[in-house]
């Protein structure tokens, strides 16, 4: 939905709109263009896409985009950014383009049950595991680790000069 809103906003500003959907490889690429029909196609592709693969390789997607875009562009990256950032590839992209990172978060991932056994599934790999939370200290440790990872991510984006928005 965020991608659709951005596409309509760019179209209203008379900017070209393109799309790259990726997992471990680029699954869908739509060259930038103007026009209502084009934007509607991009929105349809965003909302109707079902990934063929799991995982996500931001480095590979950025390399693909850098080869595709010869002119300076605005690149909006929508991701959860849970995997380590490809710093050198982002630096290259930042030198040539205006890069904005929009981090999509899930409120359910920010909550844990008070105590007990929980089953977790990695959405990208499909791997399933169980964790037993025995006390509040384990829950506090989980949230501390998440907060530290988020702080590190924000520091990396700031160091790269990339605007970062968390939704």
What are these regions (language model features)?
Residues 1-36, 64, 74-77, 83-85, ...:
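An amphipathic, basic-hydrophobic helix/alpha-beta surface used to engage anionic
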Residues 36-39, 55, 139, 150:
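Alpha-helix initiation and N-capping motif
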Residues 38-73, 85, 104-108:
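Von Willebrand factor
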Residues 53, 81, 144-145:
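Residues that cap or flank secondary-structure elements
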Residues 67-73, 85-167:
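Von Willebrand factor type A / integrin I
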Residues 78-79, 102:
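Short His-Asn-centered micro-motif
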